[in-house]
Regions:
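Flexible phosphate-sensing "switch/lid" loops adjacent to ATP/NTP-binding sites
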Residues: 1-553
Length: 553
């Protein structure tokens, strides 16, 4: 059966029963139908005195077009922990419509390990991303309206972009204000995908409604003739924006196919944003369960680095264990094996490609000082010889491997890794950051480039040099760094899979995200508004006369 058929043939518990598993009272949930709910932000305050449960971060090797199944493994682990009698909860990001209709498809797991209702989650869900889009574009409208009625704040340059939760390359650069009306000034504008909007980052890093409003007010939207920043609070827009986000800030409660609770909230990409679910969801989950399973987007060089260097730095969170998801297909792909031959047994290909996995392990274990286990997401084409070869190679580096068969067996396919994680999460670790707050922007970028990306050096465009100088002059040089680059390689070139230490990271631009509290560094040719592939997933998605959706995977 397909993923969507498996999901449709599974009887879900009503959402109030899932809430009961977490000891959440009925008055603290707002139901969106039978199987979805918002939970009150007061739940964290009510449980604040409780000790935190264990935090397990799931990341992966560098992703490939084949898909590694990070979300699938995350769900399997949560279900597996429940199978061995542990109280577990998932905290995941919400899918964006861009990938759903683009190249990646849905983001709710697969096979017997999915979060549900999968069609709802993959599409509009509870409207959080639409609310962010509305708040973002309300701000854009208010900026242009302010300029239209006299420009009292003296906008000389507008840096705030409009957004849309779809992949649409035509909107990367547009000209607005072409109506010909005398008071409307035409200008070049840009669109980001909504999940790259600073408002998404702000929502995911806010501790509560008050903090959300304050962070929104601190967003820089433009500069005057003196090159001084203009903030949202000067436009008096943060109140209306917060009103639009008053429900979006509340975490969404759903379930796995095996009825494990899941908080699915926030959805920044890890290649062009910070790639983590909301702070509110993670902190709440830690009070409600013994084990919180969360994931960070793409490979450990992107999502995990940002989870650790940005989210943990800002919140004081610290993972008790880290899972690095790998597949034999992906290892062979990084070893240069062609996609057409990827399912054939190939020890030589594994030998060449396993270095990618080694680097991610080294980053998490030695650079960040955290305990690591590798989850091998098993496919039918994997051979015992290949599995044993990888297991032996990792054993030589004192790294444990667990074969996960969640897709085929559900939580039963993750009992081994669940037991191992219980033990691993009890061991002490020596968590540390890659850079210090006191480092300059360039020092932070260089430390990430050398330690995490294995680069030789960092090269800057003239524009990037000037932008860094201006950011530090304004007093924001101590903020964390969020590098936006390709997910397919340690480098900024998606085709450079070998990534020997003789290449440079090329920085073309730097953007201050003062509301979110970090500096975005644009490396290589990464775009904050993706485009659709030649054959988008949208072509296969349909609905029949009975309202049954097909084609979401």
């Amino acid at each position: 059966m397909t993923d969507i058929e498996i999901a449709k043939n599974t009887k879900l518990d009503e959402i109030n029963k899932i809430a009961e598993k977490l000891e959440i009272k009925e008055e603290d949930i707002e139901q969106y139908g039978k199987y979805k709910a918002k939970i009150s932000n007061e739940i964290y305050e009510k449980n604040k005195s409780k000790n935190n449960g264990k935090l397990i971060l799931v990341t992966a090797i560098s992703p490939t077009p084949l898909g590694e199944g990070k979300t699938t493994v995350s769900i399997a682990i949560a279900d597996g922990l429940r199978k061995i009698g542990k109280k577990s909860i998932l905290t995941l990001r919400e899918p964006s419509l861009g990938p759903v209709f683009g190249i990646k498809g849905g983001a709710t797991g697969g096979g017997k390990v999915q979060i549900a209702p999968m069609e709802d989650i993959n599409l509009h869900f509870t409207g959080d991303i639409h609310a962010i889009t509305s708040a973002n574009n309300l701000l854009s409208a208010m900026i242009d309206n302010h300029i239209y009625f006299g420009n009292e704040l003296g906008f000389e340059k507008v840096v705030w972009k409009r957004c849309l939760d779809l992949n649409d390359r035509q909107l990367r650069k547009v000209e607005t204000g072409l109506s010909g009306e005398s008071k409307i000034v035409p200008r070049i504008d840009n669109f980001d995908i909504t999940v790259a909007s600073e408002i998404m980052a702000v929502l995911c890093l806010a501790e509560n409604l008050k903090d959300l409003k304050q962070k929104l007010g601190n967003i820089i939207i433009g500069y005057n003739k003196k090159e001084e920043p203009i903030y949202v609070k000067q436009l008096k827009a943060e109140g209306a924006m917060t009103v639009l986000l008053k429900d979006a800030i509340k975490p969404n409660l759903v379930q796995t196919l095996e009825h494990t609770p899941a908080l699915v909230h926030g959805g920044p990409f890890a290649n062009i944003a910070h790639g983590c679910n909301s702070v509110i969801a993670t902190k709440t989950a830690l009070k409600l369960a013994d084990y919180t399973i969360t994931e960070a987007g793409f490979g450990a060089d992107l999502g995990a680095e940002k989870f650790l260097d940005i989210k943990c730095r800002k919140t004081g969170l610290k993972p008790d264990a880290v899972v690095i998801v790998a597949t034999i297909k992906a290892i062979k792909y990084h070893g240069g094996v062609e996609k057409e031959k990827i399912q054939e047994e190939n020890i030589e290909g594994i030998e060449k490609g396993i270095d990618n996995l080694y680097k991610h392990i080294d980053n998490i274990k030695n650079k960040f000082g955290l305990n690591v286990i590798v989850a091998l997401n098993k496919y039918a084409s994997d051979t015992e010889k290949e599995i044993e070869y990888i297991k032996e190679k990792l054993a030589n580096k004192n790294i444990e491997l667990s074969v996960v068969e969640g897709w085929a067996k559900g939580g039963d396919g993750a009992i081994d890794i669940a037991n191992k994680l219980v033990k691993l999460s009890q061991q002490p670790n020596e968590f540390k950051y890659i850079y210090n707050d006191s480092d300059s922007i360039k020092e932070k970028i260089l430390k990430i480039a050398k330690n995490i990306y294995y680069a030789k050096d960092v090269k800057y465009s003239e524009e990037a040099e000037k932008q860094i100088e201006n950011i530090e002059k304004m007093g924001y040089g101590k903020l964390p760094i969020c590098i936006a680059k390709t997910q397919y390689s340690f480098s900024d070139d998606p085709k450079n899979l070998e990534c020997k230490d003789d290449y440079n990271i090329n920085v073309r631009g730097v953007e201050l995200k003062n509301g979110a509290g970090f500096v975005v560094v644009l490396a290589g040719k990464i775009m904050t508004m993706p485009g659709l592939p030649k054959v988008p997933a949208a072509e296969s998605i349909d609905i029949d006369e009975d309202g049954e959706i097909v084609g979401i995977f």
